Amino acid sequence: MLDVNFFDELRIGLATADDIRNWSFGEVKKPETINYRTLKPEKDGLFCEKIFGPTRDWECYCGKYKRVRFKGIICERCGVEVTRAKVRRERMGHIELAAPVTHIWYFKGVPSRLGYLLDLAPKDLEKIIYFAAYVITAVDDEMRHNELSTLEAEMVVEKKAIEDQRDADLEARAQKLEADMKELEEEGAKSDVRRKVRDGGEREMRQLRDRAQRELDRLDEIWTTFTKLAPKQLIVDELLYRELQDRYGEYFEGAMGAESIKKLIETFDIDAEADSLRDTIKNGKGQKKLRALKRLKVVAAFQTNRNSPMGMVLDAVPVIPPELRPMVQLDGGRFATSDLNDLYRRVINRNNRLKRLIDLGAPEIIVNNEKRMLQESVDALFDNGRRGRPVTGPGNRPLKSLSDLLKGKQGRFRQNLLGKRVDYSGRSVIVVGPQLKLHQCGLPKLMALELFKPFVMKRLVDLNHAQNIKSAKRMVERQRPQVWDVLEEVISEHPVLLNRAPTLHRLGIQAFEPQLVEGKAIQLHPLVCEAFNADFDGDQMAVHLPLSAEAQAEARILMLSSNNILSPASGRPLAMPRLDMVTGLYFLTTEIEGDKGEFTPAAKDQPESGVYSSPAEAIMAMDRGALSVRAKIRVRLTQLRPPAEIEAERFPDGWNMGDAWTAETTLGRVLFNELLPRGYPFVNKQMHKKVQAAIINDLAERYPMIVVAQTVDKLKDAGFYWATRSGVTVSMADVLVPPEKQEILERYEAAADSIEKQYQRGKLDKGERNEALVKIWQDATEEVGQALRSHYPKDNPIITIVDSGATGNFTQTRTLAGMKGLVTNPKGEFIPRPIKSSFREGLTVLEYFINTHGARKGLADTALRTADSGYLTRRLVDVSQDVIVRETDCETERGITVTLAELQGDQLLRDQHIETSAYARTLATDAVDANGNVVVERGHDLGDPAIDALLAAGITEVKVRSVLTCATGTGVCAMCYGRSMATGKLVDIGEAVGIVAAQSIGEPGTQLTMRTFHQGGVTGGADIVGGLPRVQELFEARIPRNRAPIADVSGRIRLEESDKFYKITIVPDDGGEEVVYDKLSRRQRLKVFKHDDGSERLLTDGDHVEVGQQLLEGSADPHEVLRVQGPREVQIHLVKEVQEVYRAQGVSIHDKHIEVIVRQMLRRVTIIDSGATEFLPGSLTERGEFETENRRVVAEGGEPAAGRPVLMGITKASLATDSWLSAASFQETTRVLTDAAINCRSDKLQGLKENVIIGKLIPAGTGINRYRNIQVQPTEEARAAAYTIPSYEDQYYSPDFGQATGAAVPLDDYGYSDYR
């Protein structure tokens, strides 16, 4: 059987009138919808049952046939087929138009596809379609040519006749005038009377002459128009057209409206046109060539595919199924209807009126007006508001047309296809669940009962608590006691998914094993809050239930929170102790001098004290109150491994479990080390947050995930336990103001006064004064901070919280207790009056007021940032969604070089960015040390141990595989991508690395600052664009705001300065032509860089520059870098620049994520010369396609195409994707669909988005083909294990029960009759 959901590609094209009639189940003839009295659809109307199917299941309109047994019968009275009512969602109708109309998408879109095809300007096209001008559709050249002389002779005769008539009339008039004058003379009339008569006569003669001349001109115009008449010629003058029609009607044909367009398309020779355009492109130049290129794109589209251009002119309009444009009755007897019904009604009304007018034989002008109105109503139906004023409904609201139903966030694509609501889900407020294990969550009983309802009902029936499903449902709804036991059983081992919006990265949805809890709030494990970015101030989370066995397996294996400890962005653990836990562990591992029971060496009069033979003994002493947790003691340890240096010294053969050694430490640290996995070296340090992070990091590298999960859980429990016992609380009494604050401020006040005096005397200008004041008050704030620091005791709770790294920083403490210091105004400049009060003392009114500026700007910024960052993520996901790991190894030899360390003198300095560049990559070549020994071989994964080995061998840089050089056609290969950051192993085939990359870059986007910073100072430096705007600028490949020129060649520079500009000339090393950079603004300052001698200084006259080097401060234009240095360099440049922005904010993202996006930006090639290939010059194609086609042509002995790589911004790259579904659901929906339909585009369904839209499994992860034929089948053992009797062997009454076999209890075979 053919499965409707099983297809490999989806094609879109133009529908012809025949297609529309084939889809249709009948013609809609009347504009009526529903009879308001009977509420039944009108016959032949927009909701007609005969066309679209019955409104009730198995029931015809007149009620003759009811019930399912008449299935498929067509009622002879009302003509309705007896079938299911849901066919009203799929059956279409159509409207037969009395006159053809054009499709607005192809006429009005930019560029106008109809205009390009017919070579007509859009303005002219509009005149023709809307009946403002006639167009010539055909001319019989041969007949005209043959009979031209005859016609010319006729024309000459006609002209002669007019001239003769004119002469005769003039002659007669002249004679009459003469006679009149004679008569007047005889009568002796006055001279002015005579003059009047003469003037009148002459005027009349002039009029005669003019009239004749006009007629002659008219004839000339008609003749010249006729001799030059050509198809596609516009005639705006109606009278001229009428004359031509009357005189020479048999030599040409012309018309107006869509009919004429239809005729033009029918007679259009596509192949001939394509050939002539190709010819123009080969030999033409300038504008002509460009226009030919653009036209060829449209013409070639119709030439190569099965599309007929006739589809752009419609003879029939499809009517979509009525259930998709419903009409519902409101209370009060009124109806609410979809806008489409109104638009359809207008079309039907005008069409019917037009038919009637044509039948009546109405005058042409009236018919044309009606045709124009029909055209406009069809335009409004397809895309309301695209041309002219939109059609409005009640309350002047534009009606939503078919195009509007697809567009935008509320359109079909984004609202219903990409984001659906799902069943088996719920949401509630979250509270903390400190007693949970990392893989558990607390689910409220009532919510669990509702979610697991079907499972509970089935199990109730299985266990014979209920006879049938109906009674089971009643039991569940009444919450009978048995239900809760069954719920416990059903819920065990069935993971649920928790999600917190906004889901910025994949850790925003994780799986947990539910534990039933009282109350109505979901309990969340404290360690996963970081990943969800959740806190407990009223956040809500949604719960989803994976139903099928496969879904549960995926949830458990791939999504369980204990398997997602590492961040996919940086590969470092996210499930770290934070806040209270950090404070607790910090308190536990602190060492306090002179605390109770501390170690004292032996003296004359007393033996040594504070020495313990085992941790147990020390704990006993603590319980008795003889020893403090934080006192320094000596203790003999046998179960904990000594630190590396002690192990090397004491146990040369290596330490084994049980070997004793003595540690000088505190009891707290011993307790802490007992939480770590066995065999982990003893950590004898105070546990600052950074140290804790380093330990967990190390665990993640060395131990399996399960061990790490257990360890962080233990750390969490210990952290909370000791945080409670530490008694760290914050009260007003803990905020201490340093006593010397006043004295410090007075000193600086005096300095500020002296600056103010100098300013008033005119020694300083305003800028200098402000700068000096800012400097003074910054120093003052700094000094108050230092005084504060020295004044605070070590055990102050606020200091403990800050020093342990739990939360907050010293600046906040200074604001609370010292002074707030300088604040900024809305422009981002410092206000030179500081806020001298601390929050503890309280601010004055003025201070409060100037502080509000900065605070409000912060809030506004955050709101804007969130939206911007979300949009950036959306574009990134869209551009990279089809990057999936498709194979294990593409076997390329290429790679990129990364730096591991720098040689400074004789020692190696480890590169600080090694974590995000070399870490987790695969080596492309063997790493060889100075003696030629292979340290790490090719294809090896660079983890921390491998990197340490390379550094120990003195290797400074290595060549690694990268997605930038991957040779896989679609997607990337696992070796080039390297290790998956989230699992710490080589990435799996099917992993959607593109989306992971987009999320990793987008998720920290909110932390990036919005502001473009100003460099302080008099020099008036240009803005430094930083933060989110800079990241967008890079990914969109825009020309940067402060663009810096780069050296086109390597050579020496000559620098000339004028008062406003620099002029830089580069004299190339190879003796080529000099390159001149003129008019470089001096505001942009020269670049500081390392010169050949190793010094860092400004660029000066006579310096040597390398190709691609920046000459001024600012950012290089990536398009320039591509032009000068090629694709590889521009990729590295973009990665580096994006990383700079993120590193400035302290965000750690691995380079490989940025590389994935950059790879997508450089996927395409512009064809310069098509050679023997099918490509059109000037068009964009995928690099892979380009290379394949060239190989094929070369193999056949043809000329390959020439192309150059282009850098596209992410928005443009998303819209240029091969998949029209993905592009249409991204932006500019109508434009993308118009283009796809004309080109008859086919979507191969390779990305994720396309498959989500049509409801198939996505081709990533377990949805990839190689995993699709795996089925889950429960085995007998698994069934047995599911419901075993709990074993009682180790209890007191084991003999009575016998051995538990673990076999399933065959409950189905028991007879329960006697129990009832």
From Swiss-Prot:
Short name of any one Pfam family annotated for the protein: RNA_pol_Rpb1_1
Residue sites binding Mg(2+) per the record: 535, 537, 539
EC primary class: transferase
Reactions catalysed: RNA(n) + a ribonucleoside 5'-triphosphate = RNA(n+1) + diphosphate
Annotated spans, Disordered: 183-209
Cofactor binding, per record: Binds 1 Mg(2+) ion per subunit.
Binding site for Zn(2+) 1: 60, 62, 75, 78
Protein residues bound to Zn(2+) 2: 890, 966, 973, 976
GO process annotations (BP): DNA-templated transcription
Top-level division of the source organism's lineage: Bacteria
CDD domains: RNAP_beta'_C, RNAP_beta'_N
Necessary cofactors: Mg(2+); Zn(2+)
GO MF terms held by the record: DNA binding; DNA-directed RNA polymerase activity; magnesium ion binding; zinc ion binding
Stored InterPro entries: DNA-dir_RpoC_beta_prime, DNA-dir_RpoC_beta_prime_bact, RNA_pol_asu, RNA_pol_N, RNA_pol_Rpb1_1, RNA_pol_Rpb1_3, RNA_pol_Rpb1_3_sf, RNA_pol_Rpb1_4
Keywords, comma-separated and alphabetical: DNA-directed RNA polymerase, Magnesium, Metal-binding, Nucleotidyltransferase, Transcription, Transferase, Zinc
Enzyme Commission numbers on file: 2.7.7.6
PANTHER family: DNA-DIRECTED RNA POLYMERASE, DNA-DIRECTED RNA POLYMERASE SUBUNIT BETA
Oligomer status and interactors: The RNAP catalytic core consists of 2 alpha, 1 beta, 1 beta' and 1 omega subunit. When a sigma factor is associated with the core the holoenzyme is formed, which can initiate transcription.
Family per record: Belongs to the RNA polymerase beta' chain family.
Purpose of the protein: DNA-dependent RNA polymerase catalyzes the transcription of DNA into RNA using the four ribonucleoside triphosphates as substrates.
Name under which the protein is recorded: DNA-directed RNA polymerase subunit beta'
Species whose genome carries this gene: Mycolicibacterium gilvum (strain PYR-GCK) (Mycobacterium gilvum (strain PYR-GCK))
Lineage: Bacteria, Bacillati, Actinomycetota, Actinomycetes, Mycobacteriales
Gene from which the chain derives: rpoC
